[in-house]
């Protein structure tokens, strides 16, 4: 699943589907995600949605938690399906978190706790819930807070700050978050 952010705000343009893994669900996967063989048996196979997925992420910066792991699985499935591999710009939030908090746990749950992000709906690892949490973690990792603007102060310094912040908010940044 993926969610799209524009200017770090969710657009509600999401990509989500359940997939038939074409093999028996392992005990670990069942415990982690909660999806049974029976539930997944009638779902599409990855090769059937690969083109839609690639179209969705085309030209977008991808924010991924533990990108090496997710990309290895995604690219393996794309290779099997005979599709191009992902070559988007990637931002790995695990790398960002390790740089910011060396020696600390940087799991998604640990980062949610560190930033006081409510993850109580995350009983299982589900793609869209994880993407939503990751978007909030990512924004915190960037230290993106609301700009401090004083609209009553017309000093040249404050006017320049206003111009800078306005131009920042005019930028259109399209990001997708991927979670397998």
What are these regions (language model features)?
Residues 61-68, 73, 77, 109-164:
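Acidic, Mg2+-coordinating catalytic module of metal-dependent nucleases/exonucleases
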